[in-house]
Amino acid sequence: MKTFNGTFFNLPPDKSISHRTALIGALSNGITEITNYSAGLDNQTTLSVLQSLGVDIQQESFLTNDGYEQRKVVIKSSGLWSLSRSKRELMCNNSGSTIRMLSGILAAQPFRTTLVGDHSLMKRPMRRVAEPLTQMGASIKLSETGAPPIEIEGKKPLSPIQFYQKIPSAQVKSLVIFAALHADGISEIIEPIQTRNHTELMLGLEPELQPDGSRKIVIEGQKNIEAKPFTVPADPSGACFLVALGLLSGKSDIRLKNVGLNHTRAGYLSLLREAGAKLPTENNRTIGGELLGDIIISNDYITKPLRINDAQIVSDIIDEIPMLAVLSAMATGEFELHHAAELRAKESDRIHALVMNLQRLGFVCEEYKDGFCVTGRTHNPTGTIEITTFYDHRIAMSFAIAGHFSNAEIQLDDNSSIAVSFPNFFSLIDSMQKT
């Protein structure tokens, strides 16, 4: 059995937080310094698009005291409405976060903009982007299928909105917040199922708990945002792959440093503990409103399959589900998931992608509209198994982890998507591996 060992400071910076620090920096009055900004392609796309809109952005690399490379981003802005019209279409590449959240800002600008992406992004649904922004007064045009390109004719100022978020989506919530910052009045967002709350924490928005358990977020429009520094923790979604690596080994000794432990992002740790893992955390502290700490995987493993049948839990672990599904199947032969239809609208139809590739590894799967289950394994194939990644970084990394514990040689049909969020994925695992 392979083992993996070491203390690691160089996990990728949090992808979600990196996007939001850059976007908020572009809306803030003054100089925003972001320490440990992500080098992933999605986050670099956000910077590139903001630069195309006239935002002054400088980026430099430096070595930490531990000898690891980090990036520092400095954004200079004069606040709301400081963007300028781009002379060309804005290329968002594969970044759904960029195209969706930026739409909320562009809806408030007094000019026309067109947002496009790569072949994968151009298939992703965007009607949930258009609906609230249209209600606020912007003109939004999509393709006939409701996908990009997104053509935005902004309105200054936007009208405030009372937005009830029927389908949980942190990106849609954030784009409405960004639009509401420019609105002429007070906007409210009602969130029945909580999604990741990084945007609210950065902007100092404190949700009001309602009698029915939902949360109300109140946004005052046209209020000056003063620039402030941000420090980005290590990405808990990226850490999940290394947690799974250690748990599948059962004999590893791994410490993952400075990982974000925000309760809306690290819910997978609680699930894995319920399945038998220990997974203690140490050195917990709060920086800029975000909880972070070190995750320990030491001679640890799960003893029970994961069964996920709660919409709030699904919202909390939406990005980790591919790795959790593969981990549970490989470790116990079983897995069950419901209330996760949102997975079909990610970089790929992740439900279909997981079922297809798990079946290639001999697992018995049943696919539902909102999830799937694994009910056993008919055989453990040998030889070479090709995994269809659908150019989805989380599918690619999940099955790359499985490859370390499979009788078959697992080959990814494409591993270039991994650079979207975890550029040093393979080199980091190589540095951990002891045979």
Swiss-Prot record:
Reaction catalysis annotation: 3-phosphoshikimate + phosphoenolpyruvate = 5-O-(1-carboxyvinyl)-3-phosphoshikimate + phosphate
EC number of this enzyme: 2.5.1.19
UniProt pathway: Metabolic intermediate biosynthesis; chorismate biosynthesis; chorismate from D-erythrose 4-phosphate and phosphoenolpyruvate: step 6/7
Residues at the active site: 319
Binding site for phosphoenolpyruvate: 15, 96, 124, 171, 350, 394
Subcellular location: Cytoplasm
Superkingdom: Bacteria
GO CC, one annotated term: cytoplasm
Binding site for 3-phosphoshikimate: 15-16, 20, 169, 171, 195, 319, 346
Single GO MF annotation: 3-phosphoshikimate 1-carboxyvinyltransferase activity
Principal localisation: cytoplasm
Keywords, comma-separated and alphabetical: Amino-acid biosynthesis, Aromatic amino acid biosynthesis, Cytoplasm, Transferase
SUPFAM superfamilies membership: EPT/RTPC-like (SSF55205)
GO biological process: amino acid biosynthetic process; aromatic amino acid family biosynthetic process; chorismate biosynthetic process
InterPro entries linked: Enolpyruvate_Tfrase_dom, Enolpyruvate_Tfrase_sf, EPSP_synthase, EPSP_synthase_CS, RNA3'P_cycl/enolpyr_Trfase_a/b
Subunit record text: Monomer.
Family: Belongs to the EPSP synthase family.
Free-text function comment from the UniProt entry: Catalyzes the transfer of the enolpyruvyl moiety of phosphoenolpyruvate (PEP) to the 5-hydroxyl of shikimate-3-phosphate (S3P) to produce enolpyruvyl shikimate-3-phosphate and inorganic phosphate.
PANTHER family (UniProt xref): AROM/DEHYDROQUINATE SYNTHASE (PTHR21090), PENTAFUNCTIONAL AROM POLYPEPTIDE (PTHR21090:SF5)
Name of this protein: 3-phosphoshikimate 1-carboxyvinyltransferase
Organism this protein belongs to: Chloroherpeton thalassium (strain ATCC 35110 / GB-78)
Lineage summary: Bacteria, Pseudomonadati, Chlorobiota, Chlorobiia, Chlorobiales
